[in-house]
Amino acid sequence: MAASLQAAATLMQPTKVGGVSARNNLQLRSSQSVSKAFGLEPSASRLSCSLQTDLKDFAQKCTDAAKIAGFALATSALVVSGANAEGVPKRLTFDEIQSKTYMEVKGTGTANQCPTIDGGVDSFAFKPGKYNAKKFCLEPTSFTVKAEGVSKNSAPDFQKTKLMTRLTYTLDEIEGPFEVSPDGTVKFEEKDGIDYAAVTVQLPGGERVPFLFTIKQLVASGKPESFSVDFLVPSYRGSSFLDPKGRGGSTGYDNAVALPAGGRGDEEELQKENVKNTASLTGKITFTVTKSNPQTGEVIGVFESIQPSDTDLGAKTPKDVKIQGIWYAQLES
């Protein structure tokens, strides 16, 4: 009996060992197949991961792409700074502007410029007589606002401003009679054209000042070296404009704040807010002729205008705005 059991045990031993070996071989093959599936390769008691290599290559490509993007961004910055460094475009004559196409003018700032004169004399050389001024153009080159300085207790003075409006502030296509007297005096009366433009500038302290650049109802007379006159400055807002509380001059609510019984001292302030005032104010402008060409009928010069800013329909005290620039006109007999 013992002998038979020993023989059975002896016969069972190889089978057990063989089963373990087969199982180990199966596990090894499975591990190898899984490793190949995930890109793992056995090599000299260590595994090298091809996936890790791919990740390194991907990271290197991302780094190279970032370097290229940074270089492109720096190049764009240089291009932009170079464009800004060029400043305003070259001033062209009237014929040069007319010879350009829309796409050649678009985005260059030329449409906001007054033409210049090629040739001529540095004085007003037109003979006495009656002319018709057309293509009258006024291009501001400087906006200053009279206000208190940034420093404490500084006296009010004309402060430099930052323009907040796009290049749409030039007055153009103005026309009217232009007369040259025998004594050398000139007279110009504005009749028609684009004679107003809404402009907003910002003071150094951050306050924004809107105003209506205009020369409405202008009748200027004097010597060509300096002829000036007062002109009309309409309200920046019309009577039908509604404020945030629905109050207007000719429409909207009469008031949006309950009026107190009185005696508080703020009745005047409440009245300014509730009762809208669209009355026009006045400004003064001075023209100076710097060059003329009687053969082409062109004349150019400089101007200085001082006019009030927006009053917010009577709620604010207007500020003085000084506008300096150049002007151009064509005179036809």
UniProtKB/Swiss-Prot annotation:
Localization of this protein: Plastid, Chloroplast thylakoid membrane
GO BP, sorted A to Z: photosystem II assembly; photosystem II stabilization
Pfam families named among the record's database cross-references: MSP
Cellular-component GO terms for this entry: chloroplast thylakoid membrane; photosystem II oxygen evolving complex
Record's keyword annotation contains Metal-binding: no
Top-rank taxon, per record: Eukaryota
Main localization, broad class: plastid
Keyword flag Transit peptide: yes
Keywords: Chloroplast, Manganese, Membrane, Photosynthesis, Photosystem II, Plastid, Thylakoid, Transit peptide
Gene3D superfamilies assigned: photosynthetic oxygen evolving center domain, Photosystem II, cytochrome c-550 precursor
Family: Belongs to the PsbO family.
Free-text function comment from the UniProt entry: Stabilizes the manganese cluster which is the primary site of water splitting.
Name of the protein described by the UniProt record: Oxygen-evolving enhancer protein 1, chloroplastic
Species annotation: Solanum tuberosum
Lineage start: Eukaryota, Viridiplantae, Streptophyta, Embryophyta, Tracheophyta
Name of the gene encoding the protein in the UniProt record: PSBO
